[in-house]
């Protein structure tokens, strides 16, 4: 069992406000959260930080989330990092594609509440073998 402050999360988004929101929610629970504006910056940050979890937006201008995800899974140092898709694309077909075809660990649609984000993060970390104290 680990303290949440030992858990590193990278949030890849094209909107600074969404990164700030995720940081606010997760840092209040003690997580170490790093934000990246866009896919290219996100891949570099994942390489540098080696996080325990990635929160990934799908629709970004420089490189979409599916491309980031594919590059992660093709990289020996990144392929085992769990990913939660965080996107405004709420259509059920996108959820089916994300969870079943790409094997994404979870999927949250915007807007989401703090409890929904925290529940998904806790669940995915648990499935990855990382137990959070007090969670």
Q: What is the meaning of each model-derived region?
A:
Residues 13:
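Conserved acidic carboxylate
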Residues 20-28:
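Charged docking surfaces used in two-component/phosphorelay signaling
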Residues 23, 67, 90-107, 119:
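Alpha4 helix (beta4-alpha4-beta5 surface) of REC/receiver domains from two-component response regulators
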Residues 35-44, 65:
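Helix N-cap/capping motif at the beta->alpha junctions
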Residues 49-55:
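Active-site beta3 strand of CheY-like receiver
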Residues 60:
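Receiver (REC) domain active-site loop signature in two-component systems and cognate sites
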Residues 111-122, 129:
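C-terminal output helix
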């Amino acid at each position: 069992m680990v303290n949440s402050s030992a858990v590193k999360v990278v949030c890849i988004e094209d909107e600074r406000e969404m990164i700030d929101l995720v940081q606010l929610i997760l840092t209040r629970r003690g997580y170490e959260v790093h934000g990246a504006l866009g896919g290219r910056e996100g891949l570099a940050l994942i390489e540098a930080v080696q996080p325990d979890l990635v929160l990934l937006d799908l629709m970004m201008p420089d490189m979409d989330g599916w491309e980031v995800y594919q590059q992660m899974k093709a990289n020996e140092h990144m392929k085992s990092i769990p990913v939660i898709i965080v996107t405004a694309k709420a259509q059920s077909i996108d959820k089916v594609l994300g969870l079943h075809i790409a094997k994404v660990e979870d999927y949250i649609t915007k807007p989401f509440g703090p409890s929904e984000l925290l529940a998904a993060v806790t669940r995915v970390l648990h499935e990855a073998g990382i137990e959070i104290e007090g969670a």
